[in-house]
Amino acid sequence: MQATLLRFGLNAKRIACGADFRFGKFAAGDTEWLKKLCEAHGGEMHVVPTVEYKGERVSATRIRKAIENGEMEDVTAMLGRPFGFCFEVVHGNHIGHTIGTPTINQNFPPRFVLPRFGVYASAVYVDGKTYCGVTNVGVKPTVGSDHALSETWIPDFTGGDLYGRTLRLELLSFVRDEKKFPDLDALKVEISLNEKTARTLFEAFEKEAPAHVHPNRHERMGKNLPRKNGTRV
């Protein structure tokens, strides 16, 4: 079954995995078995050495836990890039427009690893440019939502609405937990404070992140993202 999938289903020529990689029923398959399978079908296999961060082994489980805890600096260090997603911009309830902070809304698909609910400093890629974003991940308790989503204000973007476009967004740093405000005026004041914090974090990241984290990031992530109808952003 595994051989058929690798050879005919995926047409795999090269496979890379971690030293402790296990797969199959009851995790019976290991790197030695996979190596023999690749050799038997003319493929190549590369075992990636274990990587440590802060004295502990980096693993998918550890990265997911850090995402769920909102530890984005650690996530960036372990992934070698910021955690992000690329989803379509959908219509919301337009509260942001009402209070002068228009936002883009992006829904999370089923089984997506949800970050800790709250506000983040983010990077948003639009038409080859990188913008500072103030992103709320959660259910918007002040105005109410029946599902978790990403809602981002892009203070410096003045290019009109982005509905229907598929945009890349990266979460750089956690700012605060999600909370309910007594009214929209209080929410507006808080968003202004969050924007100042997010901008400081965004500028620090752009300046300090090593080149391998975001080489030509605006070109690599912000261009050639498709719309739903197949045209390019």
Predicted stretch roles:
Residues G92-V233:
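Phosphate/ribose-recognition catalytic cores of enzymes acting on nucleotide-derived substrates
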